[in-house]
């Protein structure tokens, strides 16, 4: 079962990825983890990627596709894999198809931008312990203070509203076109494309995914 997850940052992909991995016994392939592992293992592609990254440049699509192919040939991918965060653009999707990496199911988790902004910009963290709160969904007992220590809570830079909106802008520009791209591939009968309402509870989304992909 070869699955790809699509959705904006903050849509809840990470939670569902965890569920899918456990339910179907497939590994999650995240390009970031894969790059780090290849560099650490010192594979030829890893060494090439290290050279590029050390020079402060972006790793090319070609190199990433090579790493994906190397990764999915490993034993733990025998039953399939879960791609998260790749491909991000149409050229990457084209390159992936051209290199023979097939996908069975594309899962899109759809959450309106304003809901994502509310979810992410409402997060508060206690820096000392890593405890996470949310001003709406999981507020601390005393506003702005950690329940255990009474110390001040902070907003992570990634959760600042301006940062969240910027990341959403990049997503709509680069990755959202993949929704249409894979919709067309699905029409040709080459894979199934399912869109889920990510504003539902985590359990409801997980249940809907199982119903759709079996």
Swiss-Prot record:
It is found in: Cytoplasm. It catalyses: AMP + ATP = 2 ADP. The keyword Transferase applies. GO terms for molecular function: adenylate kinase activity; ATP binding. Residues 30-59 are annotated as: NMP. AMP binds at residues 31, 36, 57-59, 85-88, 92, 156, 167. Belongs to the adenylate kinase family. This is Adenylate kinase. It comes from Shewanella loihica (strain ATCC BAA-1088 / PV-4).
């Amino acid at each position: 079962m070869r699955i790809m997850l699509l959705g904006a940052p903050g849509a809840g992909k990470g939670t569902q990825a965890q569920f899918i991995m456990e339910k179907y016994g497939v590994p999650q392939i995240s390009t970031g983890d894969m790059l780090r592992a290849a560099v650490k293992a010192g594979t030829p592609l890893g060494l090439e990627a290290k050279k590029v990254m050390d020079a402060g440049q972006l790793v090319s699509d070609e190199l990433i596709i090579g790493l994906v192919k190397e990764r999915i040939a490993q034993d733990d991918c025998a039953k399939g894999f879960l791609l998260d965060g790749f491909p991000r653009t149409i050229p990457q999707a084209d390159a992936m198809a051209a290199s023979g990496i097939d996908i069975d199911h594309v899962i899109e988790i759809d959450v309106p931008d304003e809901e994502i902004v509310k979810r992410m910009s409402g997060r508060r963290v206690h820096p000392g312990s890593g405890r996470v709160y949310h001003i709406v969904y999981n507020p601390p007992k005393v506003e702005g203070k950690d329940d255990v220590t009474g110390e001040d809570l902070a907003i992570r830079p990634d959760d600042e509203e301006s940062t969240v909106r910027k990341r959403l802008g990049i997503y709509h520009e680069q990755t959202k076109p993949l929704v249409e791209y894979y919709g067309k591939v699905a029409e040709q009968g080459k894979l199934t494309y399912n869109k889920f309402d990510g504003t539902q509870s985590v359990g409801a989304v997980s249940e809907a995914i199982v119903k759709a992909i079996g």
